[in-house]
Swiss-Prot record:
Superkingdom classification of source: Bacteria
GO MF terms held by the record: ATP binding; RNA binding; tyrosine-tRNA ligase activity
Protein family membership: Belongs to the class-I aminoacyl-tRNA synthetase family. TyrS type 2 subfamily.
Short sequence motif 'HIGH' region: positions: 54-63
The protein, known as: Tyrosine--tRNA ligase
InterPro entries in UniProt: aa-tRNA-synth_Ic (IPR002305), Rossmann-like_a/b/a_fold (IPR014729), S4_RNA-bd (IPR002942), S4_RNA-bd_sf (IPR036986), Tyr-tRNA-ligase (IPR002307), Tyr-tRNA-ligase_bac-type (IPR024088), Tyr-tRNA-ligase_bac_2 (IPR024108)
Native organism taxonomy: Bacteria, Bacillati, Cyanobacteriota, Cyanophyceae, Synechococcales
NCBIfam families in the cross-refs: tyrS (TIGR00234)
Physiological role: Catalyzes the attachment of tyrosine to tRNA(Tyr) in a two-step reaction: tyrosine is first activated by ATP to form Tyr-AMP and then transferred to the acceptor end of tRNA(Tyr).
Swiss-Prot/TrEMBL catalytic activity: tRNA(Tyr) + L-tyrosine + ATP = L-tyrosyl-tRNA(Tyr) + AMP + diphosphate + H(+)
Length: 415
């Protein structure tokens, strides 16, 4: 009789859109399930790699999809290998870019890496942190300068010899730029090879990535094979659509929710996400069964917003945020129409935030407005304003929005 196939656990399948080496989902599924079973029998945790280049300072919910999957591997007893790409960040991943990236300094990269680790939960308990930094054997944090900075010229040439120009141009970003006559710097061809070499250096069994990383993850498999290692599995997750429901979540597109935004700001943004995205947000950002969501579209949005906010701040904070958001809109009265109006016709634009508050009478003076903003008491449509000098260029950007000072003072902005 044929052996009963090993089933891949639900936590691993959740949100997954691609798994290779095999082009056949069932084959790759079965192979990884077998590898998991072997690891359990041999008491040898899998080494699960995720690389991040610290090219910015903030992590948003779009980034968190991969960290959540990495945490799921940790909770299943495996070893997460988080690679801080302090060397590769100097080149910059060309994936998704139509031009050569601006190179960062070592100081900028290290400052960004420090903020990344803090946001992921370094120094926090495992219960509160996105990654488990405290349980022995569950996390290795490595910087790829450990192995890449010491490569000599013959070794670099050897790496280059494992790939062809044709392979590189088959990568969509490079191919598009080449076809359009947009320059490709030679050092950019090195990036996929260096990311692949990271897998060799840490002897990865699995590499996590977004769907846009398939070329780079596959390069890791090729290099592991070249160095006589057992090739890693590539497990790919989708790119999260931003709050606009159109483009990927990206700070440059102003459609993000920060990983550690305060509960009210997070909830207020999420409850406005287009209904078409609600199920994917639930699958990728929570442990909630999407089948448990209400049928009514508005209630679905609220349920998703609570679930995602709770995943970061706890259910009590999420429910409090929902109540606060409702009061913000209603002014603690019967309906939103009853919120007192503040008129922008007498405000001189461009207007800084502290001036706006005093000009419409929400604060008695500019100095009071500055104090309120710095104290975290001012919100615009639920999003905290933290910079007194934040500038609004035109009144049309504020029309219909609710400006809040403290817990009880609201004004709907109008002409």
């Amino acid at each position: 009789m044929p052996e009963t196939p090993i089933t891949m656990p639900a936590w691993l399948q959740r949100g997954m859109v691609d798994l290779f080496p095999s082009g056949q989902w069932g084959d790759a599924d079965q192979q990884l399930a077998t590898r998991l079973d072997e690891a359990r029998e041999q008491n040898r945790p899998l080494r699960v790699k995720l690389g991040i280049d610290p090219t910015g300072r903030d992590i948003h919910l779009g980034h968190s999809i991969l960290f959540r999957k990495l945490r799921a591997f940790q909770d299943a007893g495996h070893t997460a290998v988080l690679i801080i790409g302090d060397f590769t960040a100097r080149i910059g991943d060309p994936t998704g870019k139509s031009s050569t990236r601006v190179q960062l300094t070592s100081e900028q990269i290290e400052a960004n890496a420090t903020t990344y680790l803090a946001q992921l939960g370094q120094g926090q308990s495992a219960e509160k942190a996105l990654l488990d930094f405290t349980t022995p054997g569950r996390l290795e944090v490595r910087r790829n300068t450990e192995w890449l900075a010491d490569l000599d010229l013959p070794e670099v040439i050897g790496l280059l010899g494992t790939a062809t120009v044709g392979q590189m141009l088959a990568k969509e970003d490079f191919g598009n730029r080449y076809g359009s006559g947009v320059p490709i710097a030679l050092h950019e061809f090195l990036y996929p090879l260096l990311q692949g070499y990271d897998s060799v250096a840490v002897q990865a069994d699995v590499e996590l990535g977004g769907t846009d990383q398939k070329f780079n993850v596959a390069m890791g498999r090729d290099l592991q094979r070249h160095f006589d290692q057992r090739p890693q599995f590539g497990l790919l997750l989708p790119i999260l659509a931003g709050l606009d429901g159109v483009q990927k979540m990206s700070k440059s597109l102003s459609n993000t929710v920060g990983l550690n935004e305060d509960p009210l700001s997070m909830y207020s943004k999420l409850e406005k996400v287009p209904d078409a995205l609600v199920s994917s947000y639930v699958v990728l950002l929570t442990d909630l069964d999407p089948e448990a969501l209400p049928v009514n579209p508005r209630e679905r949005q609220k349920a998703m917003a609570i679930a995602v906010t709770a995943s970061r701040h706890g259910i009590a904070a999420a429910e409090a945020a929902q109540n606060d958001a409702a009061r913000l809109v209603s002014g603690s009265q019967d309906d939103a129409a009853s919120v007192p109006e503040a008129f922008l016709s007498d405000v001189n634009f461009p207007a800084k935030a502290f001036y706006l508050l005093s000009a419409i009478g929400l604060c008695a003076s500019s100095s009071e407005a500055r104090r309120q903003i710095k104290g975290g008491a001012v919100r615009l449509d639920g999003e905290k304003i933290t910079d007194p000098n934040l500038e609004f260029t035109d009144s049309s950007l504020l029309m219909g929005k609710v400006l809040q000072v403290g817990k009880k003072t609201f004004r709907r902005l109008t002409r």
